Amino acid sequence: MKKIALLADGWRRYVIYSWVEGIMEGSKELGLDVCLYFYNTNGTWSQDSKFNKGEYALNDLPDLNSFDGVVFDCTNTTNLDEIQYMVRKLQSVNVPVVSIGYKVDGFYYVGNDNKRLFRKVMDHMYYAHGCKSFVFAGGPPYHYENRMRFEAFKEALSDYGIPLTADMYMFGDFDYQTGVRYMSDWHESKKPLPDVFLCANDNIAAGLCATAEVLGYKVPQDFKVTGFDNLDKAAYFNPQITTVDNNRGNIGRNALEIFKALWNGTGDASDKYLDSEFIPAESCGCPNTGRVDYRNYIKNIIKGSVAREQEEDAVMILQKELEECNEYYDLFERYSDYIQSMKCDGVYVVGVSDLAAARNNAQFRKHGYDIDDEVVLYADDKDNGKLEFKSVNDLMQYMQSVDKNTCYMYCSLHFRDEIVGYVILRNPEFLYDHPEQFDIQSALLKRLENLFKQKVLENTNNELKNLYNHDALTGLYNRVACNEMVIPMFAELEAQNVGCTIVFLDVDDFKDINDTYGHQYGDELLKTCLLYTSPSPRDNRQSRMP
């Protein structure tokens, strides 16, 4: 059984499960026994940088040298420091690393051949449609795929004999609002319209086309637009957007092919620059592709809307039920029941000791993990039901004992940037159709933090009560405890005809000792007497009555 680690950052609050499916399905097709450990982070969703740090802390959990290969996906990561940190970390390991869509020295690359594919788009616009003025409507300037598409843009202009000027390219994000901003800013600037806006992806293209319509322009009559990635919004938009397929389904399998060649010493272990289909459509002046069934699409939208409403209702019910849980075990059990009601084979929860004990002086880590400071708080799977493990090492050994291809997905448990543990989902296939697992995880995190604070308060109150009821010198119950606990208990027992007795022991000449030798000698005398009397009463029921 080969162990593969997949480190991937989600798109906003969504999990990118297509890489997992590609690896798991590819392992069957290639005849490989694979156990995939998927470390999923969602560090691009929150506006709270400390929360995002808590997400990315998960990347420090795995011992990467213990794997047979690592797959790295930072295509959604917007934090450059995090990307650079992970690249340095991965460059130091002694196992092969395959990087998805991001070329790094020393790593194998799997992804679209962005330069060649973007050049296909430009050549089509130049030769088939006679475009002479071009604008690159780009994504983030640091993003590798965006950079490659921009390189293709510049090389094509040079080959066409068109000089590059600063007003011929724009950089932003990969989202719809970036396209909205590009079109709005261009309109307000009063600059002449280009023949074509070449967008770095379909989100930008859709935002640009929609805003153009609001501003009174017609695409492709007034100018043409192209996209990239072949998202649904390209195929079903009006006008249908010219695009390039993304190869999502093939990337995971191609990564596995590289590993297989390395493991077996045969086959092609070189970078995989994937070819994809160029799909001309209405936004560039070509006819509709005719590939889409609009009625079925509308039907699926309606069904999807109903399903989303049901899911949102279910999550709201789950949130309510989680809020009613007053013990960690009950909380994780309810969470597990919900997750396993979908396509998921098991849930395991690991927490740090300070979380488990709800210590009021808890010092949670912000970097790194210590397996000796972790406990298994909950474990349940469809093979063996409820499970108990004495240590996290025992859980890890259990997970590695699988005899079939398995995926374990890890999610961070954290209070902002403070690490409190992690959740492991076994074969969470539901994520392919329901990638919004982050909403469920957020509900769990919220209740877990509140429950921790509640337990800390309870423990603190118990500690204060213990101090209040006990003598500071001897640790015995004091007069307050006698008045508030013992006497009421006697009254209850006497009402039940149970006889009770209090025995008082007096220390002879105690006052003289205090007066003659000082109170410190009197204190020592009391503690000495306690040594002789402690073993006598059953259940150690003694008290000091000064």
Regions found by a protein language model. Give the residues of each.
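Helix-loop-beta substructure at the N-terminus of cytosolic sensory domains
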Residues: 321-365
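Structured interaction and signal-relay segments at domain junctions
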Residues: 347-396
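Conserved nucleotide-binding and Mg2+-coordinating catalytic segments in signaling enzymes
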Residues: 462-485, 505-521, 527
